[in-house]
Amino acid sequence: MANGIKKVEHLYRSKLPDIEISDHLPLHSYCFERVAEFADRPCLIDGATDRTYCFSEVELISRKVAAGLAKLGLQQGQVVMLLLPNCIEFAFVFMGASVRGAIVTTANPFYKPGEIAKQAKAAGARIIVTLAAYVEKLADLQSHDVLVITIDDAPKEGCQHISVLTEADETQCPAVKIHPDDVVALPYSSGTTGLPKGVMLTHKGLVSSVAQQVDGENPNLYFHSDDVILCVLPLFHIYSLNSVLLCALRAGAATLIMQKFNLTTCLELIQKYKVTVAPIVPPIVLDITKSPIVSQYDVSSVRIIMSGAAPLGKELEDALRERFPKAIFGQGYGMTEAGPVLAMNLAFAKNPFPVKSGSCGTVVRNAQIKILDTETGESLPHNQAGEICIRGPEIMKGYINDPESTAATIDEEGWLHTGDVEYIDDDEEIFIVDRVKEIIKYKGFQVAPAELEALLVAHPSIADAAVVPQKHEEAGEVPVAFVVKSSEISEQEIKEFVAKQVIFYKKIHRVYFVDAIPKSPSGKILRKDLRSRLAAK
């Protein structure tokens, strides 16, 4: 209060009414709550082999996996790492871990050994489920009594086969009492700054997030039991895990799983299985809009195309509409720490609303958002850009073993600060303007500058370094480095030094040699200055 006048707080809610959410249920109980209605309908389909499991089979195997995990000694609250590409077994183990009262941390199988070890150790993983091809990356972890299970037909020496889980006796699963605030998923995110951190998502949080999308008389994201949902985005990413797999399980829709994206294969599967919903990301949109082969396939079954993970330009939106004239197209918006969905396009609702091109939707139900002035911290009215914050039951519990970063992200009033600059127009639609946060988005994947900077300055010929995003037509953004040399070193040597230690999307694309890295008096890198230099090049 200043001068006796109370400041107005501008809060925004969904156009849809709040709903009752069964947030007392564990995640698996919630997702399978209506399984009797869909028991014999297709639930999981492997696009490569046509292997199909119905809902009753998936629910049963989830209980078998829970029993198998218990038999292997995994206790309630302990961690399983899924180091897998998209596959049916991913869903089995994720849901089975929920039944066991365990926690799943997901990791990109293309990570280098050091990246996997760092996450597995930070998360406290006791069991890793993976492919035989990736086992050699886990030698260090196996020497520390981490059990490795492979889903391949012939497990490597020292590993167990997935059948120890999927063929266990489901009646032998010990009963566990799961509290709504217990953690069920532990994806890793770089947050608004710094190194990757474990995001604690609870049963209550994920149940709330799924409900905000697909529950209610007028679901914001209308999935039904006749739908076939394309699952081409990686399940180790929370967007696909939540808005595809979990939402489909809850709604009784079939999930068609592709291990990796290939445009021709994708179009063949859309035609063969009459895919109705296609969640994608901007790089896939780019492939679709630039390829002439789309017209050779019948894609008329597609009724929804939803894009997330990174902003999409109006030109790409328009080009996509030309290729899929019968589909409703729109964007959502989220971040891992928000569970991940903050906003969803109301064009996807059962009773849809008109939406504007370029909008990433309106805030989900049962939540509030506000826009804060990035200088003063005051909440802003419509049509003024500032940092978007969200408060609701779906947001993370916090970062694991990192109270400092948690406090910097979720304030005392429960608001999650996203680090994204956006505005809300008069129709409550959200538009992304910029990012306050430092994270680089390469094809939707997160790249933390601090992680690459730590690698760079570890080189004896590099005195100082800073990493910032540079715009790129296909990837959206790529990491580029500004480097201060302490002795002679070439751009190529620096690129190779980093590439040996990181996954493909973290590779440095350009190196600019400078005399000094601009920093604030407190020593913080002035990334805006470096981005301005790039813009001027």
UniProtKB/Swiss-Prot annotation:
One GO biological process term: phenylpropanoid metabolic process
Pfam families for the chain: AMP-binding, AMP-binding_C
Keywords: ATP-binding, Ligase, Magnesium, Nucleotide-binding, Phenylpropanoid metabolism
Cofactor field: Mg(2+)
SUPFAM superfamilies in the record: Acetyl-CoA synthetase-like
Catalysed reactions, semicolon-separated: (E)-4-coumarate + ATP + CoA = (E)-4-coumaroyl-CoA + AMP + diphosphate; (E)-4-coumarate + ATP + H(+) = (E)-4-coumaroyl-AMP + diphosphate; (E)-4-coumaroyl-AMP + CoA = (E)-4-coumaroyl-CoA + AMP + H(+)
Source domain of life: Eukaryota
Enzyme class: ligase
One of the record's GO molecular function terms: 4-coumarate-CoA ligase activity
Region of interest called SBD1, as start-end residue ranges on this chain: 262-331
Residues where ATP binds: 189-193, 197, 331-332, 336, 420, 435, 524
CDD domains: 4CL
Cysteines joined through disulfide linkages: none
Record region (SBD2): 332-399
Pathway noted in the entry: Phytoalexin biosynthesis; 3,4',5-trihydroxystilbene biosynthesis; 3,4',5-trihydroxystilbene from trans-4-coumarate: step 1/2
Binding-site list for (E)-4-coumaroyl-AMP: 239, 243, 309, 331-332, 336, 344, 437, 441
EC assignment: 6.2.1.12
UniProt domain comment: Both substrate-binding domains (SBD1 and SBD2) are involved in the substrate recognition, and are sufficient to confer the substrate specificity.
Family: Belongs to the ATP-dependent AMP-binding enzyme family.
Job of this protein: Carboxylate--CoA ligase that may use 4-coumarate as substrate. Follows a two-step reaction mechanism, wherein the carboxylate substrate first undergoes adenylation by ATP, followed by a thioesterification in the presence of CoA to yield the final CoA thioester.
Protein name: 4-coumarate--CoA ligase
Organism field: Pinus taeda
Name of the gene: 4CL
